[in-house]
Design a protein with these regions (language model features):
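Extracytoplasmic ligand-binding site segments that recognize negatively charged/polar headgroups
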Residues: 82, 98-113, 143-163
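Bacterial Sec-exported substrate-binding components of ABC uptake systems
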Residues: 1-23, 60-63, 85, 115-145, ...
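A short, structured surface patch at a secondary-structure boundary
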Residues: 11-68, 72-77, 169-172
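Short helix-initiation/N-cap motifs at beta->coil->alpha
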Residues: 53-63, 177-191
Length: 217
């Protein structure tokens, strides 16, 4: 993890999302005190000593957060809005995040860096795999599925869809408007999937045996 030249080594940070926990860990791991109880973080060695302040889709424990005496709490706009507001009322600084594209992520990295007092790092230096490949990317048509019931696929207005566009992947759902109730995601019927007939179908593993659920349809 990058620790950088810190102006304030005593900054105490709690991250309520996997993304913000990962970013703080990469920028200055010593600042990160609390994390969400996601399997993504629990499986990584660098987070084993961090305090878990939330589980699953349940709201974070305000009492546990306060007991850690944080200087800063990072959460997701919408899902954590109520908790962040309560913490603000108690005089704790908060940052509400909404990441829809790579530019939003760059801005968040810059904001966290300034708050921690560390040298700002580019997205590419933190995540080298974000570098675009040189040469012409094959234009095979693709549909990404993030859920099997219902079949949900990201358009260009979602974080996943913006990444597909950024790396010139031919997302057949990119310009279809969302009517699913999930902003940035389109509900597909099996008939539409067959009609689109993509060269590639990418299944996002959410831990629910996505492949078998999809094939059962």
């Amino acid at each position: 993890s990058f620790s950088g030249d810190t102006k304030d080594n005593n900054k105490r940070v709690i991250a309520l999302t996997s993304l913000t926990a990962d970013l703080v860990d990469r920028l200055n791991s010593k600042s990160l005190l609390g994390i969400p109880g996601t399997s993504l973080l629990k499986s990584k060695e660098q987070f084993k000593d961090k305090v878990i302040v939330s589980q699953g889709r349940n709201p974070p424990s305000i009492e546990k957060i306060i007991s850690l005496q944080p200087d800063l709490v990072l959460g997701a706009k919408g899902f954590h809005t109520k908790a962040l507001s309560q913490l603000n009322d108690l005089g704790i600084e908060t940052i509400s995040t909404e990441i829809k594209n790579l530019n939003d992520l760059e801005l968040l990295i810059n904001r966290i860096s300034k708050n921690l007092g560390v040298d700002n790092q580019s997205l590419l230096s933190l995540v080298p795999n974000c570098e675009k490949t040189t040469g012409e990317f094959p234009s095979r048509s693709t549909i990404v599925l993030v859920s099997s019931a219902p079949l949900l696929s990201p358009n260009k207005n979602s974080w996943a869809g913006s990444l597909l566009n950024e790396f010139n992947i031919n997302n057949l759902i990119s310009d279809i408007q969302s009517k699913s109730g999930f902003d940035g995601y389109v509900t597909l019927s099996p008939e539409v999937l067959l009609e689109k007939n993509p060269d590639n179908i990418v299944l996002i593993d959410t831990g629910n045996d996505m492949q078998n659920l999809f094939l059962s349809k």
